[in-house]
């Protein structure tokens, strides 16, 4: 109708918060596991081949484990980016997860030359000069994984949900 109205769309204080006495820790764990499992199963419904982005961290390892359990058919494709020049690498953890879950593991090494070669592409895809620390690795992994799958499940955003980034 061409008119503008100013009103509050969302207020987090309108939602009931559970007190610690309303749900036991074991019930909360059971509920979270059930929600997580349902979410993964929903994401696996696809008419194209899919896989999991696997860093070796807790979030992507859990997603991969639940996906393997739910998929059952053929080995699940997992994709990891390896950055050799970092002081810390989670490669050994992604290797352990893949071995334990018997996934079809794909690892892609990101060199300094590739960082330089694809830097402009990454900035273009970000649509901003505000670079995210994982942007280059995520770009490199996605670029290479596209040869195998059309969809990747990832743990991106899980730290915000699960209380990560404590430091």
Can you say where each PLM-predicted feature lies in the sequence?
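Non-catalytic substrate-recognition/targeting regions of SAM-dependent transferases
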Residues: 1-12
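ATP-dependent adenylate-handling active sites, centered on carboxylate activation for C-N bond formation
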Residues: 14-167
């Amino acid at each position: 109708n061409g008119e503008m109205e100013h009103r509050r769309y969302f207020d987090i204080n309108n939602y009931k918060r559970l007190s610690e006495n309303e749900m036991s820790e074991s019930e909360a764990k059971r509920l979270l596991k059930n929600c997580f499992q349902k979410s993964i199963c929903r994401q696996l419904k696809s008419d194209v081949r899919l896989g999991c982005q696997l860093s070796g961290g807790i979030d992507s390892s859990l997603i991969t484990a639940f996906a393997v359990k739910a998929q059952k058919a053929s080995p699940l494709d997992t994709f990891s980016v390896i950055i050799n020049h970092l002081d810390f690498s989670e490669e050994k953890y992604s290797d352990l997860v893949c071995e334990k879950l018997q996934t079809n593991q794909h690892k892609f090494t990101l060199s300094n030359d590739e960082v330089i070669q694809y830097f402009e592409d990454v900035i273009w895809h970000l649509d901003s000069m505000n670079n995210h620390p994982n942007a280059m690795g995520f770009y490199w992994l996605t670029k290479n994984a596209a040869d195998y799958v059309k969809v990747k499940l990832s743990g991106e955003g899980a730290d915000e949900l699960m209380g990560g980034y404590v430091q």
